[in-house]
Structures are given as structure tokens and as C-alpha cells.
Amino acid sequence: GYTHAFESTFESKSGLQEYLDSAALAAFAEGFLPTLSQRSFNWGTDLGMESAELNR
């Protein structure tokens, strides 16, 4: 089973996009993601949400 979770919330869709475009995130992901045996991401769905839905 899962032992850890990483969750982020953003004030707006543009805030989420800024995070996803970040060079720092890309560098972190390059080193971190290969160490995971199980991953679950829902970014595609989140990117399609209206900003009011992102603020729930």
C-alpha cells in the first residue's frame, strides 16, 4: 500500500500552471520520481477544472 502522499493546492489555474512550468519542479521531479514504486497523479483532470473548482 501507499505509505506517503504529496498534495498541493493552488489559488488559481494560473498558479498551478506556474508551478508545473517551474524549472525547480522539473529538477526535483527528475531526481525524485524515479525513486517511487507507485505513483498517482491527477494533473490532467486538475488542469481542466474551472478556478472555482480548484479552490475547494
UniProtKB/Swiss-Prot annotation:
Q: Which InterPro entries match?
A: Dabb, Dimeric_a/b-barrel
Domain Stress-response A/B barrel positions: 1-44
Q: Which PROSITE patterns match?
A: S_R_A_B_BARREL (PS51502)
Q: Which residues form a coiled coil?
A: none
Q: What is this protein called?
A: Stable protein 1
